[in-house]
Structures are given as structure tokens and as C-alpha cells.
């Protein structure tokens, strides 16, 4: 006689209770808003386009093209022509000087980064439907703007951030003027220059002009 099949034991299959943590995580807004990502992407693309228009560094450092200007007016003309030709290179050098000055002053760099992050994430790219709540108090956009202005005044004028930035920019301007005054521009093809609006720092205007309408419309 065939053996009987073993009895089937009942197996309980408890229903898993969905955790509320994922829903709470999903309900939180992303840190990087679409406007902020768009702003960063536009700045990145425009910086790449600006750097692609820089002149060869060997041409900038050509010692055979250096000569003493005949007069102050001649030096001014040279500075204007050389700046029009080496605009991207000059601004790159000035930016490098400012960056080096901030790196050698880490506290100033930290203060400046905190100030920039505060403006970006607490005001410019913060969703309007998410007010700032601190110590149980809700801050309006006007109060947030006032606090950021006071924080900016404190960082720039009551710390060494302002002096570091001003001294670095003065050094950069002095180097640019010295090179522009002693660099003879006779061998430069100035007729091939782009309009002044296409300079390296125009990404500030271009990126800001694209992001500003959305931010202003959201704040109004």
C-alpha cells in the first residue's frame, strides 16, 4: 500500500506593515531645486564657452613683445587694447589670485561659503511654500531677506573677508594694468574681437538673467 502523504502544516504569512519612514522621506523636498540645478548648469556651460575663447598663454607671456610705453596716454591705450584681446586670460588670472587669497585665509573662505550658501538655499532657491521655522517661529521672506542682509554686512565688514577680497582684487588689477601697459599690442588682431558683452564674466549676467525671472515670479 502506498504511503500516505505527510500532512501539510499551516504556514502563517504575516502582512508586512509598510513603514511610515519612506513616505516621510519622499514627502521632503529635494535639496537641489530645479531652479538651482538649472542655474548651476547654465553657469557651467557658460564658463566652458568663456574659457574656450581665451588666448594662448604663451602669447600672453611673450617677453619679446614687452616694451616701455612712451607716455601715460600710450600706456592707457595699450591697457585698453590688451584688455580687449586678453580679456579672458586677465579675468582668469584675477580669479586665480582671489581664489589663492581665500585659500590662504581659510576662515575667510568658510565665512564666504556660508554667506553664499545662505543666500542660495535660504532665499534665492528656497520654495515659497516652505517658510523658514526657527525655534518655533516662522520667518517671512522679508524677515529672511533682512537677516541675510545683516549677515552679509557682518561677514564683509566685521570680518577679514572684505579686506582679503579687496586686497586680492587690487593685486589682480595692478598686475593686469602692468602687463597691459608694457605689452605692445601691435601684433594683435584686434579686428577679430567679439563684442564686450561676450566677456568671461558675462556668465553672471546670462545665468542670473535666466534664473531671476523664475525667482522673482515666485517671490512676488
UniProtKB/Swiss-Prot annotation:
Source species, domain of life: Eukaryota
Extent of Polar residues compositional bias: 12-27
Cell location: Endosome membrane
Residue span of region Disordered: 1-27
GO terms for cellular component: endoplasmic reticulum; endosome; endosome membrane; Golgi apparatus; trans-Golgi network
GO BP terms, alphabetized: vesicle-mediated transport
Membrane topology: Multi-pass membrane protein
UniProt keyword list: Endosome, Membrane, Transmembrane, Transmembrane helix, Transport
Tissue distribution: Expressed in roots, lateral roots, lateral root caps, stomata and trichomes.
Keyword Amino-acid biosynthesis annotated: no
Primary site of residence: membrane
Transmembrane segments: 83-103, 105-125, 146-166, 170-190, 196-216
Secretion signal, residue range per the UniProt entry: none
Assembly notes: Interacts with PRA1B1, PRA1B2, PRA1B3, PRA1B5, PRA1B6 and PRA1E.
Function: May be involved in both secretory and endocytic intracellular trafficking in the endosomal/prevacuolar compartments.
Family under the similarity heading: Belongs to the PRA1 family.
Name of the featured protein: PRA1 family protein B4
Native organism taxonomy: Eukaryota, Viridiplantae, Streptophyta, Embryophyta, Tracheophyta
Gene it is expressed from: PRA1B4
Amino acid at each position: 500500500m502506498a504511503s500516505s502523504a505527510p500532512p501539510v502544516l499551516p504556514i502563517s504569512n504575516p502582512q508586512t506593515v509598510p513603514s511610515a519612514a519612506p513616505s516621510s522621506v519622499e514627502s521632503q523636498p529635494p535639496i537641489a531645486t530645479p531652479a538651482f540645478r538649472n542655474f548651476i548648469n547654465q553657469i557651467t556651460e557658460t564658463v566652458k564657452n568663456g574659457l574656450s575663447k581665451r588666448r594662448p598663454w604663451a602669447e600672453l607671456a611673450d617677453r619679446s613683445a614687452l616694451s616701455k610705453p612712451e607716455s601715460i596716454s600710450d600706456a592707457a591705450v595699450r591697457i585698453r587694447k590688451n584688455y580687449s584681446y586678453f580679456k579672458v586670460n586677465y579675468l582668469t588670472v584675477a580669479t586665480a589670485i582671489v581664489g589663492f587669497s581665500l585659500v590662504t585665509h581659510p576662515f575667510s573662505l568658510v565665512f564666504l561659503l556660508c554667506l553664499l550658501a545662505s543666500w542660495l538655499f535660504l532665499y534665492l532657491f528656497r520654495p515659497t511654500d516652505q517658510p523658514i521655522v526657527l525655534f518655533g517661529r516662522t520667518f517671512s521672506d522679508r524677515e529672511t531677506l533682512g537677516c541675510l542682509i545683516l549677515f552679509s554686512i557682518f561677514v564683509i565688514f566685521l570680518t577679514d573677508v572684505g579686506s582679503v577680497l579687496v586686497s586680492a582684487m587690487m593685486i589682480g588689477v595692478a598686475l593686469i594694468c602692468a602687463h597691459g601697459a608694457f605689452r605692445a599690442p601691435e601684433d594683435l588682431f584686434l579686428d577679430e574681437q567679439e563684442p564686450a558683452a561676450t566677456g568671461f564674466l558675462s556668465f553672471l549676467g546670462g545665468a542670473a538673467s535666466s534664473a531671476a525671472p523664475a525667482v522673482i515670479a515666485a517671490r512676488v
